[in-house]
Amino acid sequence: MVKSEAMFTVPEFYSRRKQFVGQSSTRLDQCGLRLGMWYWKDETKTLEFKSFTPAIELKEKGKKGKAVHFAEMDSGASERLTDKRFASRDEKAAKALEKRSQQGNVTLDDVKFVALLSLQDTEMQRICSFTTFLRNKNLDSFLMALLYYLSYYLQRLSMEKNPQSRVVGLIEKKEVELVVNKLEDAQKYLAQKYCILVLGLGMADKHHLSCGKEKISDTQKDWKFFESFYTFCTCIAWIVFRRQYLTEIEEEVGRLFRTNMFNIPRRKHEDEASGGEKKRMTLVQFRRMMAKRPAIKKAVDMRSPVLSTLLPSLREKAQHITEKKYVAGIKLQPREENIITDLESVAMPIVGILGEPRNLFNPNTLLPLELEENTKPSGRSSSIVETNNTKIQNTLSLVMSKLASPSTCPK
């Protein structure tokens, strides 16, 4: 029994010894030492070292060591290869982007980018702040409310311009009443969305008091922002309504968001109606003109018509009832005041070019392709148009990169 146990324990001892020697040899190799012996060689008459590790393992280690090092490539060739790869990748990305841009329908984001590009020459000093403001949800709600209002406003203008017969039918009267009622509801809804922007909800960096963080009002920043904002809204409405009714849109936007004292488009229209010439007035005529204007204190405290729809004074209520009594020569019945709680649940109508297929429009200008083909220039002017389209596309990519980056424009 003891003999058999000895027969099994001896191989185990040798295996453990061999394992220990192997571990020690690997540790010595890591330290740069090798196990072996020194001996005298008579042929060369030198003292040489003979390693206990076999030569085959050393060759394998040498091969493994060589495999770690990478062959250096020519720098010029590598740069050319990377340039070709990046060029092919950019070309594929541009084709994919162009293909995606032709799919789907025209959205409000498309109109916002085109309006931003069209204002870059005149309003570029102030418009830089809009790159961070374009993604605001409150802005989208306000713009849709404005377009919703202007669609009914232009419909009402067309009814007023069309000559009505003396005998008005019941259907025509119902149509006028329906448009006027929808216009009134749209103005109240627009006033709610405009108050959100004025109070600075969700846009503290654009608010003149930083939503209560500052104690001193920054009127200069407030004035610059909203003046550019009104121009931006006018441009968006003009693009949506197929670049028509620019004068009507300018006057209505100026009337809604400005008082009569500060309504610049209205003054321009009055100057154009008078011939654009400044007439010399007598002292009596000047006094009569100044008597019609309100005092400075009253002018400062005046509110725009869009704000007075929510909290009108007694005088504004009476004026509104008088103006609404007759529309397009038709006497309207008084309507009970309905409180508009929320119009966001109501489906908004498709306004202008919004909702139409993208492939019918130029992606850079949102002009109908049929209109561009009919008015397509020839010769040298066509190359100028192509150059301008390239510049617009480059600026659009710059705006998209600014929106994608977290950094904002410098003040």
Curated annotation (Swiss-Prot):
It holds the Pfam family PPPI_inhib. It comes from the Eukaryota. Keywords: Protein phosphatase inhibitor. The keyword NAD does not apply. GO terms for molecular function: phosphatase binding; protein phosphatase inhibitor activity. The keyword Transmembrane helix does not apply. Inhibits phosphatase activity of protein phosphatase 1 (PP1) complexes. Interacts with PPP1CA. This is Protein phosphatase 1 regulatory subunit 36. The gene is Ppp1r36.
